[in-house]
Amino acid sequence: MADDWDTVTKIGSRVGGGGGGGPRLTTIKNKSQLNAAQRAGGIVGTEKKYGTANSSRSEAGSGQFLTKVDRSDDIVKPKTGDKELGMYIMQNREQKKLGNRLEFGKKVGINEKDLARIEKGEVPITQDQVNRIERGLEMFIRGVKKGEPKVKTFKRAADKK
């Protein structure tokens, strides 16, 4: 009974050391926190968390692609571009005398090597690249309007009323 007088009873939801009884897991943000945890003798696990949001396509999708290859019995070809589309771009670039790949690439903002690989059909073309090339050629290169001129239409403030 004497022990009851020496202990303090705490009432409330935020009282206590939490559940589990073990040390709490925390994420260490910098080197000084890591050193402090090591000096305190805590269990320290240093594992890098790899995000795929900002990494390139070849690194991000390689695991998924290899899984697809492992599960299939036949040969799985990597994704390639459309050779017909590449030839169409090259023909129109030369027909309109927009210069060689280097000059045209600078005009539309695509690297010369990337433009060469697109024209050869080695890589799939992205929508951003399609838009840039269409602006440079001033014509549609895909879809229902393929070959039609891509004309900029401006509406004046007076016409909108």
UniProtKB/Swiss-Prot annotation:
Gene Ontology CC: one annotated term: nucleus
Polar residues: bias regions: 27-36, 52-65
Ranges of compositional bias, category Gly residues: 14-23
Region (Disordered), start-end ranges: 1-66
DNA-binding region per UniProt: 101-120
HTH cro/C1-type domain boundaries: 90-144
Highest taxon, organism lineage: Eukaryota
GO MF assignments: DNA binding
Keywords attached to this entry: Activator, DNA-binding, Transcription, Transcription regulation
Gene3D superfamilies: lambda repressor-like DNA-binding domains (1.10.260.40)
Function comment: Transcriptional coactivator that stimulates GCN4-dependent transcriptional activity by bridging the DNA-binding region of GCN4 and TBP (SPT15), thereby recruiting TBP to GCN4-bound promoters. Involved in induction of the ribosome quality control (RQC) pathway; a pathway that degrades nascent peptide chains during problematic translation. Required to prevent stalled ribosomes from frameshifting.
Protein family (similarity comment): Belongs to the MBF1 family.
Name of protein: Multiprotein-bridging factor 1
